[in-house]
């Protein structure tokens, strides 16, 4: 089933073609774009790794701008397992041109085996600035940001575990495309 994403032990992402190799669209001024997914984190999304890495963010989904934008110019939801809360924490991640995470603050929690809607909308305000909204639909939380970009062509960013740390065991989540206006 294509909605089920599995990252095998020792890997960063599900097998198959990386999402960033599949161009999804081009930005035009004042034209809105939207990506909404229904996400279910399964029991095996829990993990315990080295203490200094446990707080690192994994990637859920989003978009990057430009062919090499995956680590330089992207907007996406992030996730991590919080051992003390026994819940998945969700944040938004924005990379600037220096691959520095400017904002990584958990703004909602998810229980395992429940469905959650996540929505990202963006609109090109001027030649190089996006107005971005991150909205987990079950929560009364919405983040609006202005994000600088350097390219108008954008690509998908998919389910991913870690940075340098690889999946400690099989990690599975359901990411169902609900709407895609791009």
Residue locations for each model-derived region?
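Flexible glycan-contacting loops in extracellular carbohydrate-active proteins
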Residues: 142-174
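Surface-exposed loop/edge segments in extracytoplasmic proteins
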Residues: 100-103, 138-144
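Extracellular beta-strand elements of beta-rich domains used
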Residues: 37, 171-181
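Short, aromatic/His-centered strand-loop micro-motif at the edge of beta-sheets
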Residues: 92-117
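Surface-exposed coil/turn segments at beta-strand junctions on protein surfaces, enriched
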Residues: 30, 109-113, 125, 166
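Secretory/extracellular carbohydrate-interaction modules
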Residues: 5-89
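Short tryptophan-centered beta-strand motifs in secreted/extracellular beta-sheet-rich domains
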Residues: 37, 114-124, 130-132
């Amino acid at each position: 089933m294509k909605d089920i994403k599995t990252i095998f032990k020792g890997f960063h992402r599900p097998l198959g073609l990386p999402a960033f190799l599949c161009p999804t669209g081009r930005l035009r001024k004042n034209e809105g774009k939207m990506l909404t997914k229904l996400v279910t984190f399964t029991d095996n999304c829990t993990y315990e790794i080295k203490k200094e890495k446990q707080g690192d963010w994994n990637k859920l989904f989003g978009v990057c701008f430009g062919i090499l934008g995956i680590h330089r110019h992207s907007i996406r939801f992030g996730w991590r397992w919080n051992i003390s809360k026994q819940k998945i924490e969700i944040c938004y991640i924005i990379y600037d041109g220096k691959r520095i995470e400017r904002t990584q603050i958990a703004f909602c929690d998810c229980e395992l085996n429940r469905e959650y809607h996540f929505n990202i909308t963006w609109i090109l305000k001027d030649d190089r600035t996006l107005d971005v909204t991150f909205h987990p639909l079950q929560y009364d939380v919405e983040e609006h940001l202005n994000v600088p970009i350097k390219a108008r062509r954008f690509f998908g960013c998919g389910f991913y575990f870690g940075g340098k740390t690889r999946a400690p065991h099989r990690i599975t989540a359901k990411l169902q495309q609900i709407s895609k206006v791009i």
